[in-house]
């Protein structure tokens, strides 16, 4: 992946892609699942993916949050690399001619006045002028065939679509569905501002929209009825400071007296000091705006051929059976994504220990798992462990300490923690083409994984392996002590009520006691290739 900061470097890179399909995903960084869904869609439909990361000062007002807008370059870099992005363009304001110190002395792109009469525009004067200026600048620099925007920013989407059409820019603007948390809250970088209590209040935006949507679904297309239903729901959340609640045409953004064909029900409100926006499209073709679980980006439009889905490999087994080492090596050989689920549980355990959270306080542990942003990046080689960041701080080495090892199975047994992390694991692995290892991947996280492997080894063998790992880190722990710890952890893992350690009924058992790491790796690779021969999915290019 190339991380570029200058226009010259970007132009040089893009010039090498002549004749290929290039996709652009414009962002302001602090990436979350919403951005990742755009990136996944782009990678499915284009030969090359460019992600721009630019906190655009031109779209912030004098009293807005440009200075404190969340920035996480290290985490963004890791996420983009893991997602398979080809180029990240991350210029500074001076490079884009958007230095706040120069004021208004530059060329601006002015959106049509008719698109600035409703929704956010009256409350944020100049905002969409700044958005349009930088987006068109990016389109000119990258010259993509396709550019991907989220439906959550519906007014921005409508303005960009109109400008591209009016100026005859040869780029297809691809709208992508809003990605939501389980309670309906739309993913947003500004969600990071919210406290735990504010996070619960914020879910009221979606509930209000959903109430209006359900009213429309029940047969009343009038704006009066739809808006009244949404306002009635807002009365249950008085902490929300409503800025606007409007029903408009999705393309013209003009107010609608009733929904004849399509409508956009949009809301903006303050939760404490944080301004949040959201919307739902009222359209017979749209379908339910939120199924029971998190809704990810819409599938590619008709006529687009997506790459065939590659199988998932689920590797389970007890601590010390060699899962992580083997999984990394298999993923590297087969050119698959490697997801170290154990590192996620270790990260929450380490954070709990650092913050003094009692490990028997399930509520606090669950809240910690829900609020912590975890970023994982595969090592540069099959022998390098997964790098992991928690809220922007790298903790790769810290989570491998004996203290974390001692308590991680205790934290992993907390139902709320497992629920939060499993949700993230499923999000990452849902498109296939990944190797996941843990203790319940094949039985709980991905019970439909195409290839399930359960690695075993004796307690003595696993203790020796762990001792060698610790010695390499300069730590000396007696072998008998390690055996006792492993036996205790085996009992906890196998006896816990939630997702106990056990092989899936269709898992292939491999005893690693007398096998080298490369021999175990070869067995799994052979099983994978046999699976491909039987099912005929995507060809492997290795």
Curated annotation (Swiss-Prot):
Provide the family line: In the N-terminal section; belongs to the pantothenate synthetase family.
Q: Which molecular function terms from Gene Ontology are attached?
A: ATP binding; CMP kinase activity; dCMP kinase activity; pantoate-beta-alanine ligase activity
Where, per UniProt, does this protein localize? Cytoplasm
Region annotated Pantoate--beta-alanine ligase sits at 1-280
According to its UniProt record, in which pathway does this protein act? Cofactor biosynthesis; (R)-pantothenate biosynthesis; (R)-pantothenate from (R)-pantoate and beta-alanine: step 1/1
EC number(s) per entry: 6.3.2.1, 2.7.4.25
Q: Where is this region: Cytidylate kinase?
A: 281-542
Q: Report what the protein is called.
A: Bifunctional pantoate ligase/cytidylate kinase
Keywords on record: ATP-binding, Cytoplasm, Kinase, Ligase, Multifunctional enzyme, Nucleotide-binding, Pantothenate biosynthesis, Transferase
Task: Detail which positions bind (R)-pantoate.
Answer: 59, 156
Nucleotide-binding keyword on record? yes
Q: Which Gene3D superfamilies match?
A: HUPs, P-loop containing nucleotide triphosphate hydrolases, Pantoate-beta-alanine ligase, C-terminal domain
Annotated beta-alanine binding lies at 59
Q: What does this protein do?
A: Catalyzes the condensation of pantoate with beta-alanine in an ATP-dependent reaction via a pantoyl-adenylate intermediate. Catalyzes the transfer of a phosphate group from ATP to either CMP or dCMP to form CDP or dCDP and ADP, respectively.
